[in-house]
UniProtKB/Swiss-Prot annotation:
Organism: Shigella dysenteriae serotype 1 (strain Sd197)
Reactions that this protein is recorded to catalyse: uroporphyrinogen III + 4 H(+) = coproporphyrinogen III + 4 CO2
Lineage: Bacteria, Pseudomonadati, Pseudomonadota, Gammaproteobacteria, Enterobacterales
Assembly and binders: Homodimer.
Subcellular location: Cytoplasm
The protein's name: Uroporphyrinogen decarboxylase
UniProt cross-references to HAMAP family, sorted A to Z: URO_D
GO cellular component, one term: cytosol
GO biological process, one term: protoporphyrinogen IX biosynthetic process from glutamate
Length: 354
């Protein structure tokens, strides 16, 4: 494979020295970019965009042409795995993702296949290979998956949810069925991420978007336990380099110590967690990624720079910080504000790495 020209992101995740703090943005390939909207229109719909390796590659690279980001992230969706299990994923205007046949009981779980990532999810691996080729070693490529718990919420609820009553009913009334589903998902996600790594992903991230809706005990049993299983099963080296793994539970700030025990390399932080506090608690074990409130990008440039400076000072000197937003970038953020953010991270962080 091509020599990596900028490996700041990988080095920071492994708490190795860097010249400046690396930065990328969750959902950096997305609707805030006019060129993304044009490519998506060309594809016809969202899943067609995900399933076309050339177009998925194009949208992955778009933000890198605008901003000096330190990593590219595969353009895909967390729901590719449940889709490959045959649940019939479709998108409803204004409603988000839906499944035609949600999982309602243990019998439904038993029928679910564990998808072969090179077959049913081959389009994702094609995209990874295409992106790696086109990146020409400029920056590393991040692969990702949803966590078993987060994927299960969509599969059991039949789509997005605000109250999670359907999956919580299963969790409390039929825990065996839910554990069976989560176990199958953990196996599927492990295979899926390992296939992404073999195809060329140089780091991977597990997005546990809905872990924060659980009690502490339930989080340990129904979310973290299965993420830990995945971390244990991942290829941690490829192409002569370590492949770092980041866990991100939105709303999971109170569980950082337990998350750090999984053996992952880094933890993603949402904007509700104080990064100085997080570093005090787990900084000797893992790197930290985050954690500016994505809505800060609506603020005037001077205020964005001030916030970047505050977060950098909160983390302080030394290694192990990847700057990011605390969740995905909003679709109506001014393009130049994203540019101000990225530039400020590089310029203002240099003093912390001398």
């Amino acid at each position: 494979m091509t020599e990596l020209k900028n490996d700041r992101y990988l080095r920071a995740l492994l708490r190795q020295p860097v010249d400046v703090t690396p930065v990328w943005m969750m959902r950096q390939a997305g609707r805030y970019l006019p060129e993304y909207k044009a490519t998506r229109a060309q594809a016809g719909d969202f899943m067609s965009l995900c399933k076309n390796a050339e177009l998925a590659c194009e949208v992955t690279l778009q933000p890198l042409r605008r901003y000096p980001l330190d990593a590219a992230i595969l353009f895909s969706d967390i729901l590719t795995v449940p889709d490959a299990m045959g649940l019939g994923l479709y998108f409803e205007a204004g409603e988000g993702p839906r499944f035609t046949s949600p999982v309602t009981c243990k019998a439904d779980v038993d029928k679910l296949p564990i998808p072969d990532p090179e077959d049913e999810l081959g389009y994702v691996m094609n995209a990874v290979r295409t992106i790696r080729r086109e990146l020409k070693g400029e920056v590393p490529l991040i692969g990702f998956s949803g966590s078993p718990w987060t994927l299960a919420t969509y599969m059991v609820e039949g789509g997005s949810s605000k109250a999670f009553t359907v999956i919580k009913k299963m969790m409390y009334a039929d825990p065996q069925a839910l554990h069976a589903l989560l176990d199958k998902l953990a196996k599927s996600v492990t295979l899926y991420l390992n296939a992404q790594i073999k195809a060329g992903a140089q780091a991977v991230m597990i997005f546990d978007t809905w872990g924060g809706v659980l009690t502490g005990r339930d989080y340990q049993q129904f979310s973290l336990y299965y993420m830990h299983k995945i971390v244990d099963g991942l290829l941690r080296e490829n192409d002569g380099r370590r492949v770092p793994v980041t866990l991100f539970t939105k709303g999971g700030g109170q569980w950082l110590e337990a998350m750090a025990e999984t053996g992952c390399d880094a933890l993603g932080l949402d904007w509700t967690t104080d990064i100085a506090d997080a570093r005090r608690r787990v900084g000797n074990k893992v790197a930290l990624q985050g954690n500016m409130d994505p809505s800060m990008l609506y603020a005037p440039p001077a205020r964005i720079e001030e916030e970047v400076a505050t977060i950098l000072a909160g983390f302080g000197h030394g290694e192990g910080h990847v700057f990011n937003l605390g969740h995905g970038i909003h679709q109506d953020v001014p393009l130049e504000h994203a540019g101000v953010f990225v530039e400020a991270v590089h310029r203002l962080s240099e003093q912390y790495h001398r």
